């Protein structure tokens, strides 16, 4: 089933450019630096992160005009450390007329670097080209950290990591297809969170970089326990997969976990509450012969299939289905505390 879904995604996805890492190098190393040739992007230095045309590679200092950001809600990546950067073309703004679906100006670039115990593993690039198509690709760092070259077919079980998997371009689309304009972590709820750093929602508003600044800024409803769980589900499940976008792979089953601007008035208005709490699941708690129970059984973790799926790895029911081989115990704890805080009620 997953293979069929991926094929459909590739066929239907609008405005995406597929690349191959095979072919001419497009770059050469000269005196410790990188010289880019022919407009190629086969080396990270050629993407503009450290300077144009390979400039700045020796120092690895991010170029002027590129902003670091850290969303207050983050995707679990098996414990790898991450750094994120964005570049908006001068004089442009992000179209935020639809608060849940930001649209980025052509020329926008985003980078995300993954490290394990301080060692760079990969850097991903999203670039909205002038014609509006998104280019998605990944750069694999060499073991000595001196080069980062394009890898489009992915790599499983990267040596020296807890099984980290570098996604192929099709794998990238599996998640990024869940957004109308591809970008996942640079959005209102995560950037407006109190834990956000760098280029936050407040700074975007202050600098006039949004066409329609949110009024009021989005705030996750409920108690601290509610907010922590809803925020975790939003970023790890809802933004990319469990939402109503046509290419979001998890939306068809009826479980919706993205926080929408119009539903932040109370916990009970959120899609996560309405589609999960007390709602019967098609999955069972323990395999084929387990109990038929709700996605979230109020007050009862053992009878909540959402908790069981997030606890699973290496099984078809694991959640998220890709991109992780290690259970996020801290995130699981947020969900457990939320479920246990709910008074037991009649199931729907």
Question: In which residue ranges do the predicted regions lie?
Answer:
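Short, well-ordered loop/turn sites that connect or cap secondary structure elements
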Residues: 104-107
């Amino acid at each position: 089933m997953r293979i069929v879904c991926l094929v459909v995604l590739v066929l239907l996805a609008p405005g995406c450019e597929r690349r191959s890492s095979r072919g001419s190098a497009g770059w050469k190393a000269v005196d410790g630096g990188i010289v880019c040739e022919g407009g190629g992007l086969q080396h990270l230095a050629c993407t503009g992160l450290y300077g144009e045309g390979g400039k700045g590679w020796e120092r690895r200092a991010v170029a002027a005009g590129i902003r670091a950001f850290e969303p207050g809600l983050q995707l679990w990546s098996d414990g790898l450390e991450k750094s994120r950067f964005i570049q908006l073309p001068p004089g442009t703004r992000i179209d935020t007329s639809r608060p849940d679906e930001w649209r980025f100006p052509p020329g926008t670039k985003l980078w995300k670097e993954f490290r394990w115990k301080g060692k760079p593993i990969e850097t991903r690039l999203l670039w909205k080209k002038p014609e509006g198509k998104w280019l998605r690709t990944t750069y694999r760092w060499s073991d000595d950290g001196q080069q980062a070259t394009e890898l489009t077919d992915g790599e499983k079980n990267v040596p020296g990591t807890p099984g980290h998997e570098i996604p192929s371009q099709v794998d990238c689309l599996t998640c990024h297809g869940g957004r109308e304009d591809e970008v996942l972590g640079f959005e209102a709820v995560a950037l407006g969170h109190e834990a956000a750093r760098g280029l936050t929602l407040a700074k975007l508003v202050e600098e006039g970089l949004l066409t329609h600044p949110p009024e009021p800024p989005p705030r996750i409803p409920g108690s601290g326990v509610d907010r922590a769980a809803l925020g975790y589900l939003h970023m790890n499940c809802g933004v990319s997969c469990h939402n109503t976008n046509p290419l979001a792979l998890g939306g068809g089953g009826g479980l919706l976990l993205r926080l929408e601007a119009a539903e932040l008035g109370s916990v009970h208005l959120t899609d996560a509450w309405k589609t999960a709490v007390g709602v019967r699941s098609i999955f069972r708690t323990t395999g084929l012969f387990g109990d038929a129970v709700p996605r979230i059984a109020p007050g009862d973790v053992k009878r909540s299939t959402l908790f069981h799926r997030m606890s699973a790895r290496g099984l078809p029911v694991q959640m998220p289905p890709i991109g992780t081989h290690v259970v996020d115990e801290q995130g699981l704890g947020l969900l457990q505390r939320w479920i246990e805080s709910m008074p037991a009620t009649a199931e729907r």
